[in-house]
Amino acid sequence: VGYNAHDMDVWSDCIARLAQMAGVVPGDRVQMAFGYGMFTGGFGLHYGCQKLGCMMIPAGSGNTERHIAMIGDYGTTVLIATPSYALHMCEVGERLGFDWKASTLRVGLFGGEPCPPGLKAEIEERMHIVCTDNYGLTEVMGPGVSGECLAARDMQHIAEDHFLWEVVDPETGEPVGEGEMGELVLTPLCKQGIPVLRYRTHDLTAVHTEPCACGRTLARMDKVRSRSDDMLIIRGTNVFPSQIEDVLTGIEEVTPHYHIIVETRGGMDALIVETELRPEAFRDSFEAMDALRARIAEKLKGTLLVAPEVRLVEPGGIERAIGKAKHVDDRREK
C-alpha cells in the first residue's frame, strides 16, 4: 500500500493525537518494539510520537533481553509493542531480576492484535504501567484509525475527520443500527497514495456516538475482539478464538499464552486447546491436574457450546511471539 508525503503527514497527525489520548506527552522517551520493515506499525507510530515531541528509541523487534536493558539504560517512559510481546518482556524481565516497579516506564501503547481485559490487567500489574489499545489496518492507513482515551477505556475514539465509518451486516452488507455489532467499513477521506472506498475490514465491532467522559465528541468503537474471517466452524457451531482467550484470561492457574488446534477425527471436527500452566499452579498430583483440566474444559464448553479437549502445557511450553501471535492451527482435511 503506497503513501505520498501528504499521507505520511496526515498519518503522523493521527498517531500524535492517539498517543496524546493515551497519556504520552512531549519529551517522553518512546521505545519501539515493532519492526521497521514493510509492517506499517513501526514507521507510523515512530513518526506520530516524534511529531508529538517525543524522543524515539528505534529498538525494533526481537532480542528481548536487549529491550529490557535499554529501558534501564535510556530511561524509557513509553513502550510500543504487541500485548503478547509485552507479556513476554514481563516474563523475561522477572527472570533477569529486572525491577519493573522501579523502572521509568509508565505507558504501554499496544497494537497489532487484540488485547483482552484480563491480559491488559496482568501486564499493567506486572509492569506497573498504564496500557492502551489502538486500532488500524494497512489497507486504509495503518495504526491511527482509532485509539483509547484514559477516561473510558472500553472503547476507542475514531478519527472521524479522516475516516468515514459504517457498520454493516457481514452477510448482507446492509447497515446495522447504532450500537449493534457488525463489520466495520472504512473510507479514508484524506488518503492520496492509494485511496479506497468503503473498505470492508472483516473486523467485528459496534460504534457509539454519545459523548465521552473525556470531553471528546468523536464516535467510539468497541474494541475489535474478532474478525468475520477468523471464525472457526466446529461441528456446525461458530467459534471465535477471542472467546477462548476471554475464558482463559479469567482462569488464574494458566497464563494468557494458548494455542488452538482443529483437526479431523473419524470424520468429525475436533477442537484442542493448549493452555500454559503458571509455575505456582503446577501440582505433582495427577488428580489435581486432571481436575483443573476438566474445570477449564467445562468453562470453555459453556461459552463455545462445543466440548474441547484441553491440554495443560508446562510453563514456557508455548512459543512466544515477537510480532503478532498466531493462535490457530487448522489441520482439518480440506
Name each model-derived stretch.
Residues A297-K334:
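Conserved C-terminal "lid"/linker of ANL adenylate-forming enzymes
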Residues V1-T132, V140, V145-L150, D154-M155, ...:
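Active-site phosphate/ATP/adenylate-binding loop shared across adenylate-forming ligases
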Residues A59, N134, V168, E263, ...:
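Conserved beta-strand termini and adjacent loop/short-helix elements that scaffold enzyme active sites
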Residues G97, T172-G173, L305, G323:
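Detector for glycine-centered tight turns/loop "hinges" at secondary-structure junctions
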Residues Y3-H6, V10, S84, P114, ...:
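Conserved active-site and cofactor/substrate-binding residues in soluble primary-metabolism enzymes
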Residues G112, G136, G236:
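Active-site glycine-centered loops adjacent to acidic/histidine catalytic or metal-binding residues
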Residues L79, V185, L189-V306, I322-G323:
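AMP-binding/adenylate-forming catalytic core of the ANL superfamily
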Residues R106, C115-P211:
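Conserved AMP-binding/adenylate-forming
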